């Protein structure tokens, strides 16, 4: 039987470029372990260009990236408006895209728009699901409207931020808040703030990443929980995982970028999280509800905060969960008796299924007729 060709895309121009490479390595190995697919790899360099497959294989093997990119760029006609994606065409046809691009391009809907334009199946959520979920402010608005508990927040831009002094923030949200760039992932552009000086610095930092910034209340005694969700119309939810860092209960520690991807030796992981049956049921249901409200398909990770009274708050969704050796998403499915090879096989099947469903939808239009719309000279 002819193997289906899977285009594994990784890298990108976000601050999570290197994380994407590590996730892609594990996805590559998992896809290969199924013995069902031919894998074609495409790295997206930090300059936004898709690299040819041979160069991409070297980068996936963690060879020094910049010389590889420099050599590739010498072969590119940069005057061609489609030069950035020319490598896709030169690799021939493939059956499905498997994006592993964290942050910009991969999680904001950009790549999904390209896949839709090319009329090809892909793994994961549709463009609108990615775009909405990547915007933390818009996500919280949708969660709130649909009755899914989340933390209190304020959204500011560079102009309206002047109306929110630190004293006003404290009165509204409390004396510990998190300041976040609205459209970033993996704790990039996020600061924990406890005073006016930190608040000013945090706003300045977050506005480097986005023109929209979220200011969010801290949750007292918070435990951080993660839940994996996979599927389309009838999604599956994983066991719940928990992680704590030193001083997290007092509010002095939190699960930041360093703890996620650089050094997690101080992080305590717990799978399954030790929760009451009632809280476990509520968290899983909230995860499923959010998955549907945000129009997610294929895969997602839902992050929660559990307060000192064991009340869960949905933090944010991640529509393209990390799959590094440190990633809890990967471990959650292992614990749920779905190993890596089985997981990627299911994700690929979900991609084909969603594509087939969308093909049944009508995109036809009714002509208004020349006599109604007039002629153009």
UniProtKB/Swiss-Prot annotation:
Source superkingdom: Bacteria
Family: Belongs to the D-alanine--D-alanine ligase family.
HAMAP family assigned to the protein according to its UniProt record, in alphabetical order: Dala_Dala_lig (MF_00047)
Entry's Gene Ontology cellular component terms: cytosol
Ranges of residues in domain ATP-grasp: 140-349
Keyword Nucleotidyltransferase found: no
UniProt cofactor(s): Mg(2+); Mn(2+)
Binding-site list for ATP: 170-225
SUPFAM superfamilies for this protein: Glutathione synthetase ATP-binding domain-like (SSF56059), PreATP-grasp domain (SSF52440)
Listed GO biological process terms: cell wall organization; peptidoglycan biosynthetic process; regulation of cell shape
EC number: 6.3.2.4
Residues the record lists as binding Mg(2+) 2: 316, 318
Gene assigned in the entry: ddl
Gene Ontology MF terms: ATP binding; D-alanine-D-alanine ligase activity; metal ion binding
Protein name, as recorded: D-alanine--D-alanine ligase
Keyword field: ATP-binding, Cell shape, Cell wall biogenesis/degradation, Cytoplasm, Ligase, Magnesium, Manganese, Metal-binding, Nucleotide-binding, Peptidoglycan synthesis
Pathway annotation: Cell wall biogenesis; peptidoglycan biosynthesis
Principal location listed in the UniProt entry: cytoplasm
């Amino acid at each position: 039987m002819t193997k289906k060709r899977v285009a594994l895309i990784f890298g990108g121009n976000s601050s999570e470029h290197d994380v994407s490479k590590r996730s892609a390595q594990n996805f590559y190995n998992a896809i290969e372990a199924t013995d069902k697919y031919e894998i074609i790899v495409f790295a997206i360099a930090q300059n936004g260009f898709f690299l040819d497959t041979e160069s991409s294989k070297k980068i996936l093997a963690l060879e020094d990236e910049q010389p590889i990119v420099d050599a590739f760029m010498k072969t590119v006609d940069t005057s061609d408006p489609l030069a950035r994606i020319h490598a896709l065409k030169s690799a021939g046809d493939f059956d499905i895209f498997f994006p592993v691009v964290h942050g910009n391009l991969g999680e904001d809907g950009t790549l999904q728009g390209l896949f839709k334009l090319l009329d090809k199946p892909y793994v994961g959520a549709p463009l609108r699901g990615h775009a909405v979920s990547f915007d933390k402010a818009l996500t919280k608005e949708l969660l709130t409207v649909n009755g899914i508990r989340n933390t209190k927040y304020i959204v500011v831009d560079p102009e309206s931020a002047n109306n929110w002094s630190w004293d006003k923030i404290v009165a509204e949200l409390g004396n510990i808040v998190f300041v976040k760039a609205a459209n970033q992932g993996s704790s990039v552009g996020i600061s924990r703030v406890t005073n006016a000086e930190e608040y000013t610095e945090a706003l300045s930092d977050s506005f480097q990443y986005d023109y929209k910034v979220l200011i969010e209340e801290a949750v007292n005694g918070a435990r951080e929980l993660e839940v994996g969700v996979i599927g389309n119309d009838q999604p599956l939810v994983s066991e719940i995982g928990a992680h704590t860092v030193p001083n997290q209960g007092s509010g002095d520690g939190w699960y930041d970028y360093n703890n996620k991807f650089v050094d997690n030796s101080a992080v305590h992981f717990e799978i399954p999280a030790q929760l009451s049956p009632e809280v476990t049921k509520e968290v899983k249901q909230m995860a499923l509800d959010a998955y549907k409200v945000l129009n997610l398909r294929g895969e997602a990770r839902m992050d929660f905060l559990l307060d000192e009274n064991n009340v869960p708050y949905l933090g944010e969704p991640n529509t393209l969960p990390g799959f590094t050796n440190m990633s809890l998403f990967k471990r959650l499915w292992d614990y749920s008796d779905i190993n890596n090879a089985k997981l990627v096989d299911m994700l690929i099947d979900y991609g084909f299924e969603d594509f087939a469903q969308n093909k049944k939808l009508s995109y036809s239009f009714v002509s208004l007729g020349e006599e109604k719309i007039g002629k153009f000279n």
